[in-house]
Amino acid sequence: MKPPSFDYVVADSVEHALRLLADGGDDAKIIAGGQSLVPLLNFRMSRPSLLVDINRVPGLANIRKSDQTIAIGALTRHAKLTTSKTISQNLPILSEAAAWIAHPQIRNRGTIGGSLAHADAAAELPVVLLALDAYVTAQSLQGERKIPLKELLVSHFVSSILPGELIVEVNVPQLPHGSGAAFDEFSRRHGDYAIGGAASIVTLDEQGKCSRARITVLGGGSTAIRCQEAENILIDSTLSSHDIAAAAHAAVQGLDPVPTVHGSAQYRAQVIRTMVERTLAKALHRARPTKESMDH
């Protein structure tokens, strides 16, 4: 299928893009990599009258590290997340997840800002960034908003970004010392949409017990989901195999996986449970060397 007709304008600055968005109102859309938007256009699920191309806007593809956060420009390509030393050294789970996204051609074009703005329930980055307690910085002609991921992701292809707003940056708090994190997913073939996936982060205290946990899942409903009851099971535990199994069981309670040609809801829930177990075990393994290096 082919998209409906639309006007196309290339913005040369953030302010220019914001003026174009304000003038276009509900009928204006941002385009960068087009990973999510172009399929929606082709299937006529989205019918904007104006596309604002931000690929030439300077300063939106930078990655900056501060004492407390990593700031990632909204135009940062998925491929850059897999190769950036700043990301691999400070947020390796983000590099790990980005490598799962589709195929190299798409990773070379798709952007972190676009992935979040479109809130595709099948996307990897929202799941990981939700686990990382990330927030986005969105700008409009009226000012700036900081939006936590838990408030940004509303439903499948529905985010809380308002007409006239542009995501300019993704801000990720640095993990506490003694933390380990992991992402994994299962699909029929690499590059296909995942049947199920999970991101897990654990932090160990001086006694080797879990002081902090984050578990988020992919494929469990209409958006990325945080499993707080499962996290609570792990707090003050030694993260034994029994603890991990109990948390994985709790994580899939109350999920609402959508059955597809690739698997029933029950099958997808089982896949998610396995991914939670697997990522928790990996996160624990990665947290232990971090903790041990602190003690020497």
Curated annotation (Swiss-Prot):
What is the catalytic activity of this protein? 6-hydroxypseudooxynicotine + A + H2O = 2,6-dihydroxypseudooxynicotine + AH2
InterPro entries per record: CO_DH_flav_C (IPR005107), CO_DH_flav_C_dom_sf (IPR036683), Diverse_Substr_Oxidored (IPR051312), FAD-bd_PCMH (IPR016166), FAD-bd_PCMH-like_sf (IPR036318), FAD-bd_PCMH_sub1 (IPR016167), FAD-bd_PCMH_sub2 (IPR016169), Mopterin_DH_FAD-bd (IPR002346)
Any single biological process term in GO: nicotine catabolic process
- The EC code for this enzyme is 1.5.99.14
| Flavoprotein is among the record's keywords | yes
**Sequence ranges assigned to domain FAD-binding PCMH-type in this UniProt record:** 1-177
Keyword terms of this UniProt record = FAD, Flavoprotein, Oxidoreductase, Plasmid
Please give the Gene Ontology molecular function terms for this protein. 6-hydroxypseudooxynicotine dehydrogenase activity; FAD binding
Q: Which co-factors does it depend on?
A: FAD
Origin superkingdom? Bacteria
Q: Where does FAD bind?
A: 30-37, 111-115, 124
Q: Copy the pathway line from the protein's UniProt record.
A: Alkaloid degradation; nicotine degradation
Q: How is the cofactor bound?
A: Binds 1 FAD per subunit.
Job of this protein: Molybdo-flavoprotein enzyme complex involved in nicotine degradation. The subunit gamma (large subunit) contains the substrate-binding sites, the subunit alpha (medium subunit) binds FAD and the subunit beta (small subunit) has a 2Fe-2S ferredoxin-type domain which binds 2 2Fe-2S clusters.
Describe the subunit structure: Heterohexamer of 2 alpha (kdhA), 2 beta (kdhB) and 2 gamma (kdhC) subunit. Dimer of heterotrimers.
Q: What name goes with this protein?
A: 6-hydroxypseudooxynicotine dehydrogenase complex subunit alpha
* Organism name: Paenarthrobacter nicotinovorans (Arthrobacter nicotinovorans)
Which gene underlies this protein? kdhA
